[in-house]
C-alpha cells in the first residue's frame, strides 16, 4: 500500500528528532482527512524574502546558508534526502527561537541508503522530476536519480536567488510543463558557476562549482561549504550574530552563555568577534549546558512549543510504530535491483576546484 505524502512526512519526522526540525505532536485520521499536528513556527524564508523587497543582504544570506547546511547535513546523516529544497520549505522559529532556521515538508523525501543491502541506492536515469524546477539540480531536471548532491545544489541556487532577487531560468513563457522543464534544465546547464555568481564573492562561485561536481554517491564536505560562507562573513567584517535583515532589533540571546565552534576552527563568543581557536574543539553551550557535536554552526536552545494541548484523532498513529515503519520507507521509486553502490566507491574528486 502506497503512503500518502503526509504519512511519509509523519514517518520521517518521527525518525528525525533534532534541533531545527519541527516536533510532531500527533498524526492520525479523522473521517476523510489525514491530520498531522506539529509545533507552530514562524514565517517561511520565501515570505520574509518577498516582504524584504525580494533581496537579502550578503550577511543574512550567509547566516541562513550556514544553518541550511547544518540542517541538511543532519538529515543526510540519517540516510534521507529531502528532494524539495526551496525557500518555502525553510521557516524561522518563534519567540526565543526566532533566530533559528527550521526545515519542513518531507512529503517527497526518501532514503538514499538501502537498509537491506547496506549500500547506497543505485544510479537510475529516465526519471520524472521530483521537487521544484526553479531550485532543482541539473541532474534532477535531466531525469537522473537524486542523492545528497542534489539537495546541496538546490541550497546553492537559493543563496543566489536571495542575493540577486531572481534566477536566470525564471519567467520562461512555456505552457507545456515538460517543455518548460527541458528549457530550465538547458538554461541551468548553460549558465556556468562563474556567470551565475558574477559580481558576488568568489566563495559563492566555488560553492556552486563544488556541489555541481559532486559524484552520485560522494559524501559531501559540509564543513568546507560552511567555511566558504563563514569566510564571506569574516571578509566583510561581520559575524553570525543572528541579526537578520527583517529584525528590528537584535534577537534576545544570552550571549554570556553562548559559544559555538566548528571543525575549521572559527568561534563566535557572543561579543561580535570571530576567533581562531582549537580546531579539534567543537561544542555548543547554552544556559551552561554543553552539546557535543561533530560539526556545524548553529546555536542549541530549548524548543518553543506553541501547542499546549494536542487534540485526539480517531485512529491516531503511535510514534513508535511510525519509527518502526521507517525501515520500510522506499529507497527508490523503481524496484531496487540489489546492485551494491558503496558510499566509499568515490574519492573526493571535486576537491581540485577548491581555491
Where are these regions (language model features)?
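Extended, low-complexity, intrinsically disordered C-terminal regulatory tails
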Residues: 234-355
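Activation segment/activation loop of eukaryotic-type protein kinase catalytic domains
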Residues: 93-130
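Catalytic-loop of the protein kinase fold
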Residues: 76-94
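Activation segment signature within eukaryotic-like protein kinase domains
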Residues: 64-65
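Short beta-strand micro-motifs within the conserved protein kinase catalytic domain, predominantly
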Residues: 23-34
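The N-lobe alphaC helix and its flanking beta3-alphaC-beta4 segment of protein kinase-like domains
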Residues: 1-19
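Structural motif in protein kinase domains
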Residues: 41-51
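Conserved C-lobe activation region of Hanks-type protein kinase-like domains
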Residues: 138-198
Amino acid at each position: 500500500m502506497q503512503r500518502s505524502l503526509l504519512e511519509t512526512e509523519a514517518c520521517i519526522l518521527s525518525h528525525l528528532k533534532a534541533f531545527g526540525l519541527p516536533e510532531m505532536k500527533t498524526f492520525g485520521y479523522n473521517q476523510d482527512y489525514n491530520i498531522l499536528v506539529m509545533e507552530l513556527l514562524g514565517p517561511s524564508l520565501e515570505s520574509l524574502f518577498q516582504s524584504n523587497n525580494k533581496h537579502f543582504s550578503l550577511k543574512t544570506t550567509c547566516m541562513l546558508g550556514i544553518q541550511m547546511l547544518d540542517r541538511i547535513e543532519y538529515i543526510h546523516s540519517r540516510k534521507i534526502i529531502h528532494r524539495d529544497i526551496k525557500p518555502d520549505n525553510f521557516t524561522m522559529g518563534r519567540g526565543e527561537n526566532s533566530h533559528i532556521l527550521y526545515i519542513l515538508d518531507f512529503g517527497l523525501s526518501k532514503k538514499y541508503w538501502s537498509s537491506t543491502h547496506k549500500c547506497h541506492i543505485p544510479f537510475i536515469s529516465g526519471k520524472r522530476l521530483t521537487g521544484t524546477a526553479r531550485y532543482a539540480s541539473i541532474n534532477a531536471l535531466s531525469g537522473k536519480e537524486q542523492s545528497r548532491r542534489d539537495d546541496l545544489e538546490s541550497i546553492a541556487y537559493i543563496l543566489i536567488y536571495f542575493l540577486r532577487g531572481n534566477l536566470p531560468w525564471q519567467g520562461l513563457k512555456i505552457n507545456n510543463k515538460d517543455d518548460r522543464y527541458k528549457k530550465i534544465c538547458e538554461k541551468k546547464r548553460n549558465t556556468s558557476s562563474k556567470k551565475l555568481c558574477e559580481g558576488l564573492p568568489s566563495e559563492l562561485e566555488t560553492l556552486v562549482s563544488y556541489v555541481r561536481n559532486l559524484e552520485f554517491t560522494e559524501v559531501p564536505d559540509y564543513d568546507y561549504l560552511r567555511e566558504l560562507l563563514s569566510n564571506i562573513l569574516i571578509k566583510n567584517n561581520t559575524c553570525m550574530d543572528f541579526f537578520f535583515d527583517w529584525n528590528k532589533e537584535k534577537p534576545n540571546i544570552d550571549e554570556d552563555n553562548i559559544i559555538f565552534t566548528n571543525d575549521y576552527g572559527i568561534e563566535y563568543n557572543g561579543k561580535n568577534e570571530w576567533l581562531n581557536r582549537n580546531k579539534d574543539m567543537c561544542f555548543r553551550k547554552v544556559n551552561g549546558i554543553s552539546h557535543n557535536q561533530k560539526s556545524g554552526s548553529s546555536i542549541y536552545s530549548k524548543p518553543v512549543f506553541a501547542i499546549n494541548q494536542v487534540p485526539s484523532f480517531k485512529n491516531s498513529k503511535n510514534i513508535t510504530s511510525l519509527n518502526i515503519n521507517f525501515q520500510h520507507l522506499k529507497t527508490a521509486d523503481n524496484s531496487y535491483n540489489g546492485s551494491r553502490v558503496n558510499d566509499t566507491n568515490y574519492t573526493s574528486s571535486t576537491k581540485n576546484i577548491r581555491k
